[in-house]
């Protein structure tokens, strides 16, 4: 809902389609008549569909309505999760212990719900043996296949090769 809804005198239309406080349709009334009806029950006249012909207005407690909307928006923001991409750097000639350390880090990131970008940087003549780097990345993907899916297969970009792993979702 928009934060600046038309309320009471802010409504510019001469005639409005009126909905009562309990949700029943009252019909097309003049703005003055609708405002009087709202004031008689100590509520506000709020335009809920200003683009309709005639605009649809509802009799409600605007302060309470705005508070409820803010609460809903806050809950929705709470439920949203930001996905971070963590990077793990490897080398094509990585030793087993170093590989296991990088693997442990990647698994930790994946278990927290983050994506992992595994990168291998080729230095000097190592670029001619890019298949060694590809094997290292595929090994990492295979070791993580129980908790992750491969989002982007190993691919070369300049002197680096990348692989992106995303955590498996429970759906």
UniProtKB/Swiss-Prot annotation:
GO BP term, example: ribosome disassembly
Keywords: Cytoplasm, Initiation factor, Protein biosynthesis
UniProt-recorded Gene Ontology molecular function terms: ribosome binding; translation initiation factor activity
Pfam families assigned to the protein according to its UniProt record, in alphabetical order: IF3_C, IF3_N
Source organism superkingdom: Bacteria
GO cellular component, one term: membrane
SUPFAM superfamilies: Translation initiation factor IF3, C-terminal domain, Translation initiation factor IF3, N-terminal domain
PROSITE patterns membership: IF3 (PS00938)
NCBIfam families: infC
Quaternary assembly: Monomer.
Protein function: IF-3 binds to the 30S ribosomal subunit and shifts the equilibrium between 70S ribosomes and their 50S and 30S subunits in favor of the free subunits, thus enhancing the availability of 30S subunits on which protein synthesis initiation begins.
UniProt name for this protein: Translation initiation factor IF-3
Native species: Halalkalibacterium halodurans (strain ATCC BAA-125 / DSM 18197 / FERM 7344 / JCM 9153 / C-125)
Gene coding for it: infC
């Amino acid at each position: 809902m928009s934060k600046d809804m038309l309320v009471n005198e802010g409504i510019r239309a001469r005639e409005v389609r009126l909905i009562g406080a309990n949700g029943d349709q009252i019909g097309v009334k003049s703005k003055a008549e609708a405002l009087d009806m709202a004031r008689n029950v100590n509520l506000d006249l709020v335009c809920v569909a200003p683009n309709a012909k005639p605009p649809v207005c509802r009799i409600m407690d605007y302060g309470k309505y705005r508070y409820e909307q803010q609460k809903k928006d806050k809950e929705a923001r709470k439920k949203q999760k930001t996905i971070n991409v963590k990077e793990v750097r490897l080398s094509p000639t990585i030793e087993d212990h170093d590989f296991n350390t990088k693997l442990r880090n990647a698994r930790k990131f994946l278990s927290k719900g983050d994506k992992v970008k595994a990168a291998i940087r080729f230095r000097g003549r190592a670029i001619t043996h890019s298949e060694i780097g590809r094997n290292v990345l595929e090994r990492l993907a295979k070791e993580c296949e129980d908790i992750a899916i491969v989002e982007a297969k190993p691919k070369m970009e300049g002197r680096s090769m990348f692989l992106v792993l995303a955590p498996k979702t429970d759906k």
